[in-house]
Amino acid sequence: MKRLLPSLLAIASFTAMCRSNAAPLIYQGADGPAKGKQLVFIASDHEYKSEEALPELARILAKHYGATCTVLFGIDPLTGYIAPGNSNIPGTDALKTADLLVIFTRFQNLPPEQMQPIVDYLDRGGPVIGLRTATHGFKIPADSPFAKFDFQYKGEEFKNGFGRQILGETWVGHYGPNHKSSTRLDIVPEAAAYPILRGVKDAWAEVGAYNAYPIEGSGILVTAQPLTGMEPTSPVDETKKPMPAAWVREYKSASGKAGRAFTTTCGGSGDLMNDGFRRLLVNATLWSLGLENSIQPDNDISLVGPFRPTWHGGAKRARDIKPEDLAGWDSPILPEEKK
């Protein structure tokens, strides 16, 4: 046993070192209404290609609005390559000074040193934007000190975990056939004057709708109308009534401070190609930062750099890509797979 101990310690040390061996991707803004704001984006899902969506959104907010945007990914601890869905996300300590968390994860069970900064951020009531699978962003064993963040947590004090208690809803199920049904996004008439909706029109998402029944106190801004095909012009699915697709709420933090939250059940990488949906996300960011007075219906939401989302059609994810391969304004998102 004495002989084994040094080896075990060496393995543990190596594993911890590997977990932290990927440098974060940072887009440094220069000027704009969000100048000086620190935004942290966490991307690690298995299906909807958050590793494409969040870097592009971060670029838009950095270049057009002046924010400093740090993008974190699920990382293969041995290679440093982006590994979507991997429960290893180095760099979450950036949340210590963050003004906003944008999260797009699915079924994560992070090591304590990576999960604790997220908990600390929520405990101080930091604003949160959650996209698509963030409603079931954590899947954590019952014996973990972070078990209450699990999307199926049963305890009444934090029922259904991070999704329900912070974002306003957990995973309920698909609403219509995913990959066969896209989603028209309609503004709720009673919410039309809300700042987040300024300039938003003709919004559409490639992804199918989710069942969603936001927690009491949520303000529903947009509903999802399932379509029978994968084009904005596809016919309406007459068997499906509108379902909540985007809402706002305030969550109560451990510090007692109320934290702003915006949630959308859409957000696949291809959804950002739609001007209406992209504006919705940009406006939601400014609102989350308390900058709603800066939201104008004609604010710049143009794409930054080559953006080629690949969710629709089931294209394979590019492999052997590191965060630094996405640096700067002009690198492709994502680059071609390395040969």
Task: State what each model feature region is.
Residues 1-4:
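Positively charged n-region of N-terminal signal peptides that target proteins for export
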Residues 6-19:
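Bacterial N-terminal signal peptides
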Residues 23-34, 52-53, 63-67, 228-230, ...:
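Extracellular ligand-binding/catalytic regions of CAZymes and related secreted enzymes
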Residues 25-29, 40-42, 46-137:
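Helical hinge/lid and interdomain linker segments adjacent to catalytic or ligand-binding clefts
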Residues 35-36, 131-234, 297-339:
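An acidic, glycine-rich "communication" segment
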Residues 39, 43, 221-223, 262-266:
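Active-site-proximal beta-strand elements of phosphoester/diester hydrolases
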Residues 44-47, 176, 180-185, 235-237, ...:
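Active-site rim elements
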